[in-house]
Amino acid sequence: MKLPLKYENKRKGLEFISEKTRYKILLTLLASENPLSFSRLKLILSSIPENSLNYHIKILKENDFIKNEKRTEYKRSEPRSFYSLSQRSIDLLESLGLTEVKEEFQALFEQMT
């Protein structure tokens, strides 16, 4: 039996974000009030090696789970690239009920930062 397309897409999304590092990145972005730079993500998710974090961010971007905003006006010492959730991620996390507990994630996020 073939699943209807909307359920197949959801299944693929669930499979994709079930990878632990990607899940942590998405929940961190969900908890953040603002987009986060790579250096900020690296600081918050310090248990994840930098090359692994970079790899999973790349995969999340390529599959439209996160957005990458590049700022054109910046000081040399400031980050230029910031990450936030895409609508695809928001929809998936919402369907899982995770956006309903955003305040809890934000409280955890505040403790981590």
Features from the language model and the residues they span:
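N-terminal "first-domain core" detector
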Residues: M1-K2, Y23
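Amphipathic alpha-helical dimerization/coiled-coil segments
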Residues: K2, Y7-N9, Q87-T113
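N-terminal helix-turn-helix DNA-binding core of bacterial DNA-binding proteins
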Residues: K12-I48, S52
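Short, cationic-aromatic polyanion-contact patches
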Residues: E15-T21, S37, R71-S95
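Residue-level detector of family-conserved "landmark" positions at structurally sensitive sites
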Residues: S39, S52, K70-R71, E103
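Short, intrinsically disordered/low-complexity patches at protein termini
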Residues: P49-E50, I59-E62, D91
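Residues within the DNA-recognition helix of helix-turn-helix
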Residues: H56
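A short, conserved structural fragment
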Residues: K61-T72
